[in-house]
Amino acid sequence: MAEALGLAGMTETPAVIFLGQRPGPATGLPTMTEQGDLLFALHASQGEFPRCILAPKTPDDAFYLTVKAFDLADKYQIPVFIMSDQYLADTQFTCERFDTSKITTDRHLVSDGELESMDAYKRYSITPDGISPRALPGQSKHLVVADSDEHNEEGHIDQTADNRILMMEKRMRKLKGLTMEMESPEVYGPREADVTLIGWGSSYGPIEEAVDLLNEEGQSLNLVHFTHIFPMKREEVRNILLNKGTTVCVESNATGQFAKILKTEADISVDVNLLRYDGMPFTPGYIIRALQEKKVI
């Protein structure tokens, strides 16, 4: 998968990768759950290129985020990860019928008319936003050329230093527009609280319920939950998380992977990591007991 991911990054081919996480390495715990592949999704394959990571919190969210993933992949010509896990896949939910009227499809291809008006077609044309015109092979009289080696605007191999800089910067410029399309994290509960729990992906339900149970007992907690993981809206995330009380990052992995992304992408350091990596999903009771053991509440 990592090799194919790099090929998509270099050829600027849209790709959506559904990554269903479970405990590894190797066969690991094949029927149990974990959130252990986040940093793999962020860094997999050789070299640097733009990518996007989304993590649905519910089946409803999975449906609509998948639609968004395909749109972003087509628009920015990048790989997009959808991070699920065994817990989200196996849990039974009752939800409203999906509203397909919200769905629009745009492959973001160059039109036949635009191609006919071009004297020459450059698949990797240098553009201000980094997005080059994408045509399908056979769509017009123009030749579509792609190569996994570094290439010039026409798609032919070019390994000169000047060309490498031009193409690398062109690809990375996509991150600016992509970041604008990311949604800020959801804040659940009171805006101001003594303790802020931070979660991502499928852990939303158990954390939400733990917040409700503790607030009913007179505690003061809220939840900041992420479904749009990367790229991150740095300033918006900082505005939400700075000057909070005690911050606790709740994750199903052994190393606090999302907390590391918060540090590198938003320069936010959490106070406490609440981690579970025994293959079982979070429950409200587990979260509450862990908060008590860590003397957070």
Residues covered by each model-derived region:
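Flexible, low-complexity linker and terminal segments
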Residues: 65, 70-297
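Short, conserved catalytic or adaptor-binding loops enriched in Gly and charged residues
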Residues: 40-47, 265-266
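Glycine- and acidic
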Residues: 48-55, 192-196
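Short, functionally important structural connectors and interaction interfaces within domains
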Residues: 30-33, 46, 180, 274
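Thiamine diphosphate
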Residues: 1-43, 52-73
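Short, basic, glycine/proline-bearing loop/turn elements
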Residues: 51-57, 219-224
